[in-house]
Amino acid sequence: LLAERGLTERDIKVINLDTGSTQAALVSNGVDAAFGGRELFKLRDKGLIDIIYDNPSQDVRYTRQTALVVSSDYEKEHPQNVQKVVDTLVDAAKWSSDEGHAEQVFAEWAKSNDPVESLRADFAGSSLRDKVSPLVDNFLIGRYQAVADQAKAEKLIRRPVTVEGWFAPGYLQAALKSRGLEHYWTPYGPDGKQPAADAVAVATSKQGS
């Protein structure tokens, strides 16, 4: 985001704080500004801070990704358990992707201390189906590689890191196929744009190899 506007980390003084400390620092004027997520909406709604940038164009480069991690040893010893977990997550993603369930989804997520109003604000202008997609597509893999490359460029790590071999999409593909959901979610290319139909087939083939 800084580079997009011709800035570098040397143009600002960066302090690494956890979420709670960041909010406290903002409210007490301990910092001039902060990067954050949906947790900042509740401070804005209380009139405690102003939000000057909120990714209005939904640029996927400024999004966060999450993944389910399993150790290699456990996966080899208990593949059926791994499949059960992935199956359950796919079922949950399918239900959560239905816009008709949006308020129920937000109410459930609000149990983690994110106000429903903040969740609504965070998801404004975007679809639940895209947001909760479980796909391991070229966009997801590309984002992990981009972060690794940036860490090397910023000298946070000494050696380049490749994410090749980090992902095992076989369990996901099995879950999607058994539920007839192979084409329910849209796979995206590295730039976050929907690839052509033939590109999807190539990406799926490579990931499953």
Regions from the language model: what does each represent?
Residues 77-161:
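Secondary-structure end/capping motifs
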Residues 10-11, 135-136, 180:
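A generic structural signal for short
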Residues 7-27:
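Short helix-initiation/N-cap motifs at beta->coil->alpha
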Residues 14, 31-32, 139:
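Residues that cap or flank secondary-structure elements
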Residues 5, 29, 46-47, 154-155, ...:
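Residues at alpha-helix termini
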Residues 149-209:
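Conserved C-terminal helix/tail region of periplasmic/extracytoplasmic solute-binding proteins
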